[in-house]
Amino acid sequence: MGTPTSKAVVPEVNRAKIPYIGPFTGAEFLRNPANKNIFNIRASYFSETKKLVDHFINDLGYKKIAVFIQDDGYGAAGKAGVQRALRMRGLKIHAEGRYKRNTLDVEQGLNSIMTKKPDAVIMVGAYKACGAFIKMSHDKGFYPKFANISFVGTKKLIAELGDAGDGSYISQVMPNPDESTLKIIKDFKADMQSYGVDNPYYTQLEGYLNAMVIVDALEQSGQYLTRDRFIGAMEGMKNKDFGGLKVNFSKSDRQGLDNVYLTQIQDGKALPIQTMK
């Protein structure tokens, strides 16, 4: 579940005291303050956007960073992460553009950003809209550095962009399924191949890890499973090693992983990189 859906279900989660594991969003309201029933595994949007901001500034010397966002809770959560990361550097968002959810009406948002001539644009939206934004930017002769966060969907964004994707950045909350040598990656790929999937991708890996965490907590809950026992088992994960990815929870910390990885689209693939060039 993403940001708007999570925001809608959290009151019911709290009312019924149902454990909510691994929401597919980095929104801050699921993390702070800590909620007894909620356990986030993927890194927050702040961690992702900070990674992008830090690299734009440290590697490229960029300070004029714009945002293009979906006009809803998801976009607002991503924008808040960028604002916070820039504020830590004494900077502000240089320009902002928006588009309406479930549309491809990106031109007005693009024009709002173009007039300010930013060095880079961090995008928080759906893959079709973000793809349309980048392609329209190129059509208009506008070539800043583009970056998306992981929620965009790497595989779908690359397919949407075609050749226009080369050079764009995507932050990831899971290691690269094709490049990493971690044990979890080897196990994941072997298990996926047993189901006829030869080229698994990031989202599938995230679901795989989420399932591993849940199964471990169920096993640690003992013979007589209750919600409180399950929550206690989740809270008891201290540096728990899942094939090289170490998950941590506590009563006051509902963020299992903080890992963020940087990739760049090159020749139709999202390749891991250490620095922006």
What function would you assign to each model-found segment?
Residues 134-207, 264-266, 270-272:
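Extracellular/periplasmic periplasmic-binding protein-like sensory domains
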Residues 10-18, 54-62, 83-91, 111-118, ...:
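Sec-exported extracytoplasmic/periplasmic mature domains
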Residues 3-11, 119-140, 210:
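Hydrophobic alpha-helical
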Residues 1-96, 143-170:
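Extracytoplasmic ligand/sensor domains, especially the bilobed periplasmic-binding protein
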Residues 36-42, 72, 173-178, 196-201, ...:
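Second-shell loop/turn segments in exported
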Residues 194-204, 215-269:
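Segments of small-molecule ligand-sensing domains
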Residues 48, 78, 129, 184, ...:
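Catalytic-loop motifs flanking and including active-site residues across diverse enzymes
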Residues 48-51, 98-112, 180-181:
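Structural motif
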